Amino acid sequence: MTTNAASSATPIPSDAVLRDRPSDLAPPSRRRRVALALSGVLVLALPLLWGLGSLVALLTGHEADHRFHQLTGEGVLLGVLWAAGPVALLLASWRGRPVPGWAWPAHAGFVLASVVTASFVPGDGVRVLAAIVAVTAALLWWAVPALPRLRGLVDGLDPVLSPLALLGAALYAPYVVAQRHLQATRHDEHAEMTHYFDMAWLAVAIVLLLVTAAISRQAGRTAILAGGAGLGVGVGGLLLVHPTTWFVLAALHGGAVLGAAVLQRRTSVVRPSGGRTSV
Protein backbone atom coordinates (compact mmCIF):
# COMPACT_ATOMS: atom_id res chain seq x y z
CA MET A 1 0.00 0.00 0.00
CA THR A 2 1.36 3.46 -0.92
CA THR A 3 0.71 6.67 0.95
CA ASN A 4 0.51 10.09 -0.61
CA ALA A 5 3.51 12.01 0.76
CA ALA A 6 1.85 15.38 0.61
CA SER A 7 -1.22 14.23 2.50
CA SER A 8 0.82 12.46 5.16
CA ALA A 9 2.98 15.52 5.71
CA THR A 10 0.00 17.83 6.19
CA PRO A 11 -1.67 17.43 9.59
CA ILE A 12 -5.42 17.21 9.54
CA PRO A 13 -6.92 19.73 11.97
CA SER A 14 -8.95 18.25 14.78
CA ASP A 15 -12.68 18.79 15.13
CA ALA A 16 -12.02 21.09 18.07
CA VAL A 17 -9.75 23.33 16.01
CA LEU A 18 -12.26 23.45 13.18
CA ARG A 19 -15.07 24.38 15.55
CA ASP A 20 -13.02 27.20 17.04
CA ARG A 21 -11.89 28.66 13.72
CA PRO A 22 -13.94 31.80 12.89
CA SER A 23 -15.94 31.56 9.70
CA ASP A 24 -18.21 33.94 7.85
CA LEU A 25 -21.95 33.41 7.85
CA ALA A 26 -24.22 34.41 5.01
CA PRO A 27 -24.46 38.21 4.79
CA PRO A 28 -27.61 39.42 6.55
CA SER A 29 -30.51 40.36 4.32
CA ARG A 30 -31.91 43.88 4.19
CA ARG A 31 -34.86 42.79 6.31
CA ARG A 32 -32.52 41.22 8.86
CA ARG A 33 -30.47 44.40 9.07
CA VAL A 34 -33.60 46.46 9.61
CA ALA A 35 -34.54 44.13 12.48
CA LEU A 36 -31.03 44.40 13.92
CA ALA A 37 -31.07 48.19 13.67
CA LEU A 38 -34.48 48.58 15.30
CA SER A 39 -33.79 46.11 18.10
CA GLY A 40 -30.35 47.66 18.61
CA VAL A 41 -31.84 51.12 19.08
CA LEU A 42 -34.34 49.76 21.59
CA VAL A 43 -31.86 47.70 23.60
CA LEU A 44 -29.12 50.35 23.69
CA ALA A 45 -31.21 53.48 24.22
CA LEU A 46 -31.30 53.37 28.02
CA PRO A 47 -27.72 52.20 28.75
CA LEU A 48 -26.26 54.78 26.37
CA LEU A 49 -28.51 57.55 27.64
CA TRP A 50 -27.79 56.84 31.30
CA GLY A 51 -24.17 55.86 30.84
CA LEU A 52 -23.12 58.79 28.68
CA GLY A 53 -25.24 61.23 30.67
CA SER A 54 -23.65 60.08 33.91
CA LEU A 55 -20.17 60.26 32.37
CA VAL A 56 -20.73 63.86 31.29
CA ALA A 57 -22.08 64.76 34.73
CA LEU A 58 -19.12 63.06 36.39
CA LEU A 59 -16.56 64.85 34.22
CA THR A 60 -18.21 68.26 34.55
CA GLY A 61 -18.85 68.03 38.28
CA HIS A 62 -22.62 68.33 37.91
CA GLU A 63 -24.34 67.22 41.14
CA ALA A 64 -21.03 66.47 42.83
CA ASP A 65 -22.70 64.70 45.75
CA HIS A 66 -23.84 62.01 43.30
CA ARG A 67 -20.41 61.28 41.82
CA PHE A 68 -20.12 57.77 43.22
CA HIS A 69 -23.49 56.76 41.83
CA GLN A 70 -22.72 58.48 38.52
CA LEU A 71 -19.64 56.30 38.23
CA THR A 72 -21.27 53.07 39.34
CA GLY A 73 -24.95 52.17 39.61
CA GLU A 74 -26.60 55.24 38.16
CA GLY A 75 -24.69 55.20 34.95
CA VAL A 76 -21.18 54.48 33.77
CA LEU A 77 -20.33 50.99 35.07
CA LEU A 78 -23.92 49.76 34.88
CA GLY A 79 -24.14 51.10 31.33
CA VAL A 80 -20.98 49.24 30.32
CA LEU A 81 -22.26 45.92 31.69
CA TRP A 82 -25.64 46.55 30.06
CA ALA A 83 -24.34 47.49 26.62
CA ALA A 84 -21.30 45.23 26.20
CA GLY A 85 -23.15 42.08 25.17
CA PRO A 86 -25.66 43.76 22.83
CA VAL A 87 -22.95 45.78 21.06
CA ALA A 88 -20.92 42.62 20.39
CA LEU A 89 -24.02 40.76 19.17
CA LEU A 90 -25.01 43.59 16.85
CA LEU A 91 -21.56 44.15 15.35
CA ALA A 92 -20.97 40.47 14.62
CA SER A 93 -24.45 39.92 13.19
CA TRP A 94 -24.30 43.04 11.01
CA ARG A 95 -20.98 41.90 9.52
CA GLY A 96 -22.16 38.34 8.98
CA ARG A 97 -19.68 36.94 11.49
CA PRO A 98 -20.24 34.37 14.27
CA VAL A 99 -21.11 36.14 17.50
CA PRO A 100 -18.42 36.00 20.22
CA GLY A 101 -18.99 33.18 22.67
CA TRP A 102 -19.17 35.57 25.64
CA ALA A 103 -21.63 38.10 24.18
CA TRP A 104 -24.93 36.30 24.60
CA PRO A 105 -24.13 34.91 28.11
CA ALA A 106 -23.05 38.40 29.20
CA HIS A 107 -26.30 39.94 27.99
CA ALA A 108 -28.41 37.11 29.39
CA GLY A 109 -26.66 37.40 32.75
CA PHE A 110 -27.38 41.12 32.90
CA VAL A 111 -31.04 40.57 32.01
CA LEU A 112 -31.32 37.94 34.75
CA ALA A 113 -29.72 40.35 37.23
CA SER A 114 -32.31 42.98 36.31
CA VAL A 115 -35.24 40.64 36.88
CA VAL A 116 -33.83 39.16 40.10
CA THR A 117 -33.04 42.56 41.63
CA ALA A 118 -36.42 44.06 40.72
CA SER A 119 -38.16 41.07 42.30
CA PHE A 120 -36.99 41.86 45.83
CA VAL A 121 -35.60 45.42 45.93
CA PRO A 122 -38.30 48.11 46.08
CA GLY A 123 -38.32 51.28 44.03
CA ASP A 124 -40.61 53.31 41.81
CA GLY A 125 -40.80 51.75 38.37
CA VAL A 126 -38.11 49.13 38.91
CA ARG A 127 -40.28 46.23 37.75
CA VAL A 128 -41.30 48.13 34.64
CA LEU A 129 -37.62 48.80 34.02
CA ALA A 130 -36.77 45.11 34.40
CA ALA A 131 -39.55 44.24 31.95
CA ILE A 132 -38.15 46.74 29.44
CA VAL A 133 -34.69 45.21 29.82
CA ALA A 134 -36.06 41.70 29.25
CA VAL A 135 -38.36 42.54 26.33
CA THR A 136 -35.76 44.57 24.41
CA ALA A 137 -33.23 41.80 24.98
CA ALA A 138 -35.66 39.22 23.60
CA LEU A 139 -36.22 41.37 20.50
CA LEU A 140 -32.48 41.57 19.91
CA TRP A 141 -32.00 37.83 20.36
CA TRP A 142 -34.80 37.25 17.86
CA ALA A 143 -33.10 39.56 15.35
CA VAL A 144 -29.64 37.98 15.71
CA PRO A 145 -29.39 35.34 12.96
CA ALA A 146 -27.26 32.77 14.83
CA LEU A 147 -27.09 32.77 18.61
CA PRO A 148 -24.70 30.26 20.22
CA ARG A 149 -26.35 27.01 21.20
CA LEU A 150 -27.08 26.47 24.87
CA ARG A 151 -25.77 22.93 24.59
CA GLY A 152 -22.19 22.87 25.76
CA LEU A 153 -22.32 26.35 27.29
CA VAL A 154 -21.62 24.93 30.76
CA ASP A 155 -18.38 22.98 30.40
CA GLY A 156 -17.03 22.58 33.93
CA LEU A 157 -15.80 24.71 36.80
CA ASP A 158 -12.84 26.98 36.20
CA PRO A 159 -10.28 26.27 38.98
CA VAL A 160 -9.38 29.96 39.36
CA LEU A 161 -12.61 31.81 38.66
CA SER A 162 -14.84 29.42 40.64
CA PRO A 163 -13.41 30.30 44.08
CA LEU A 164 -13.34 33.97 43.06
CA ALA A 165 -17.03 33.69 42.16
CA LEU A 166 -17.81 32.21 45.58
CA LEU A 167 -15.84 34.97 47.28
CA GLY A 168 -17.68 37.53 45.18
CA ALA A 169 -21.06 36.13 46.18
CA ALA A 170 -20.06 36.23 49.84
CA LEU A 171 -18.74 39.79 49.46
CA TYR A 172 -21.68 41.27 47.59
CA ALA A 173 -24.59 39.48 49.31
CA PRO A 174 -24.53 41.65 52.47
CA TYR A 175 -24.00 44.75 50.31
CA VAL A 176 -27.12 43.96 48.27
CA VAL A 177 -29.12 43.41 51.47
CA ALA A 178 -27.88 46.74 52.84
CA GLN A 179 -28.80 48.58 49.64
CA ARG A 180 -32.25 47.02 49.71
CA HIS A 181 -32.73 48.24 53.27
CA LEU A 182 -31.64 51.76 52.32
CA GLN A 183 -33.97 51.84 49.33
CA ALA A 184 -36.88 50.67 51.47
CA THR A 185 -36.33 52.95 54.47
CA ARG A 186 -34.63 56.13 53.24
CA HIS A 187 -36.53 59.11 51.88
CA ASP A 188 -33.59 61.17 50.64
CA GLU A 189 -32.75 62.20 47.09
CA HIS A 190 -30.74 59.03 46.50
CA ALA A 191 -33.73 56.87 47.38
CA GLU A 192 -36.06 58.96 45.22
CA MET A 193 -33.72 58.42 42.28
CA THR A 194 -33.52 54.67 43.15
CA HIS A 195 -29.74 54.86 43.51
CA TYR A 196 -29.75 52.14 46.15
CA PHE A 197 -31.68 49.87 43.80
CA ASP A 198 -29.15 50.66 41.08
CA MET A 199 -26.27 49.66 43.34
CA ALA A 200 -27.97 46.38 44.24
CA TRP A 201 -28.60 45.81 40.53
CA LEU A 202 -24.94 46.41 39.69
CA ALA A 203 -23.77 44.10 42.49
CA VAL A 204 -26.06 41.26 41.41
CA ALA A 205 -24.91 41.69 37.80
CA ILE A 206 -21.25 41.50 38.81
CA VAL A 207 -21.82 38.24 40.68
CA LEU A 208 -23.89 36.63 37.92
CA LEU A 209 -21.37 37.55 35.23
CA LEU A 210 -18.57 36.13 37.35
CA VAL A 211 -20.50 32.91 37.95
CA THR A 212 -21.11 32.67 34.19
CA ALA A 213 -17.38 32.93 33.52
CA ALA A 214 -16.65 30.33 36.19
CA ILE A 215 -18.87 27.68 34.61
CA SER A 216 -18.38 28.43 30.91
CA ARG A 217 -15.01 28.66 29.21
CA GLN A 218 -16.43 30.21 26.05
CA ALA A 219 -18.01 32.95 28.18
CA GLY A 220 -14.78 33.60 30.07
CA ARG A 221 -14.54 37.21 28.94
CA THR A 222 -17.51 38.07 31.16
CA ALA A 223 -15.01 37.84 34.03
CA ILE A 224 -13.22 40.86 32.57
CA LEU A 225 -16.47 42.82 32.72
CA ALA A 226 -17.21 41.63 36.26
CA GLY A 227 -13.69 42.27 37.52
CA GLY A 228 -13.48 45.71 35.95
CA ALA A 229 -16.84 46.72 37.41
CA GLY A 230 -15.92 45.38 40.86
CA LEU A 231 -12.63 47.23 40.78
CA GLY A 232 -14.47 50.39 39.77
CA VAL A 233 -16.94 50.05 42.64
CA GLY A 234 -14.16 49.53 45.18
CA VAL A 235 -11.85 52.30 43.99
CA GLY A 236 -14.77 54.64 43.39
CA GLY A 237 -16.03 54.10 46.91
CA LEU A 238 -12.59 54.74 48.39
CA LEU A 239 -12.11 57.95 46.41
CA LEU A 240 -15.62 59.37 46.22
CA VAL A 241 -17.37 58.16 49.39
CA HIS A 242 -15.13 57.28 52.32
CA PRO A 243 -12.59 54.54 52.99
CA THR A 244 -14.23 51.44 54.42
CA THR A 245 -13.11 47.84 54.71
CA TRP A 246 -15.81 46.74 52.28
CA PHE A 247 -14.62 49.06 49.53
CA VAL A 248 -11.05 47.85 50.06
CA LEU A 249 -12.19 44.24 49.73
CA ALA A 250 -14.27 45.07 46.65
CA ALA A 251 -11.27 46.71 45.00
CA LEU A 252 -8.97 43.79 45.85
CA HIS A 253 -11.49 41.22 44.68
CA GLY A 254 -12.22 43.08 41.45
CA GLY A 255 -8.51 43.46 40.75
CA ALA A 256 -7.91 39.76 41.37
CA VAL A 257 -10.76 38.77 39.05
CA LEU A 258 -9.61 41.16 36.35
CA GLY A 259 -6.01 40.00 36.60
CA ALA A 260 -6.98 36.32 36.48
CA ALA A 261 -9.29 36.86 33.52
CA VAL A 262 -6.71 38.81 31.51
CA LEU A 263 -4.01 36.24 32.28
CA GLN A 264 -6.26 33.38 31.23
CA ARG A 265 -7.18 35.23 28.07
CA ARG A 266 -3.52 35.62 27.11
CA THR A 267 -2.58 32.02 27.85
CA SER A 268 -5.73 30.27 26.59
CA VAL A 269 -5.21 27.45 24.06
CA VAL A 270 -7.37 24.81 22.47
CA ARG A 271 -7.28 21.78 24.71
CA PRO A 272 -6.57 18.40 23.06
CA SER A 273 -9.74 17.03 24.64
CA GLY A 274 -11.84 19.34 22.51
CA GLY A 275 -12.29 22.28 24.88
CA ARG A 276 -12.82 25.73 23.50
CA THR A 277 -10.72 28.82 23.81
CA SER A 278 -12.30 31.98 25.12
CA VAL A 279 -13.51 34.18 22.29
Segments and roles (model prediction):
Residues 81-99, 139-146, 206-215:
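Canonical alpha-helical transmembrane segments
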Residues 1-39, 266-279:
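Actinobacteria-biased recognition of intrinsically disordered, low-complexity terminal regions
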Residues 137-159, 256-276:
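Membrane-water interface at the C-terminal end of transmembrane alpha helices
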Residues 201-279:
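C-terminal transmembrane-bundle signature of multipass membrane proteins
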Residues 34-40, 92-109, 160-163, 219-228:
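Membrane-interfacial loop-to-transmembrane alpha-helix junctions, especially the N-terminal start
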Residues 20-29, 74-83, 106-113, 147-150, ...:
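Hydrophobic alpha-helical transmembrane segments
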Residues 38-50, 106-118, 131-145, 156-181, ...:
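Alpha-helical transmembrane segments of multi-pass integral membrane proteins
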Residues 49-79, 114-130, 174-201, 235-253:
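Membrane interfacial helix motifs at helix-loop boundaries and amphipathic/re-entrant anchors
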